[in-house]
């Protein structure tokens, strides 16, 4: 049975916890923090890699919008369209706090055939 992209994603949602649903060719990748204060970041990098582990996109703290308890990056349409339609990518967030504490978060990115990023799964 062939599931449409939307149905596949609904099925996946039942299996794993969602970080954020992002729709469109200029998606916003959003991370919310409950313990760490993003204002204390001295460095933060968002890295997207393809299935083979090749880095295809990297954004730094200068590209981020830092909220009270969150950090987010907006991908440009060109960046999103540069990803392979229907492809699977991994996304890693690494950060360093003023006191030297380090942290990381890993997630899978799923692209639908029309190059819209529909969801981030952790």
Question: Which residues make up each language-model segment?
Answer:
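Contiguous segments within soluble domain cores/interaction surfaces
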Residues: 2-122
